[in-house]
Amino acid sequence: MTVEGDLTFRELARKLADVIEAMALKLEDTAGLLKKERLLLAGKDYASLQSLLKELERSVSDFLGLEAERDRLAGQLACVLGCDPKMSEIASNLEEETSKPLVDAADRLQRSIKGLKSEFEITSRLLDESKKLGDLVLSQLRGLTGSGFSVRG
């Protein structure tokens, strides 16, 4: 059975697996960028930090493009197979030889999502703690000015 551009459903499944693998790799790269971001924040290298933030934006944009391609391919494959465009549905309607790369890619994507979520949480906590410390220092400095002490005498 063939679909768009004379692709067989096996070839379409392979393309879908490749896109999902690319999505996982993009998330893993993004997690690496978040680790670099934390190092740059600690080192106060603001020029490099701005460059890294632009790289993070590109990474997110690339991922969204891959996600749209995944949705398109999954929709086509599901239409050919007569099922919902969910990975579990698609995989259950394919032979094991054809579904294994898809299932493996989906598993890797899930692991990548968990890894990225962990990196976001670590970065978020670091920024929250930094803000709290900054607020504490400012509060202490304000307290000094209200104590009657004057630098001018």
What are these regions (language model features)?
Residues 2, 85-153:
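Short terminal interaction segments
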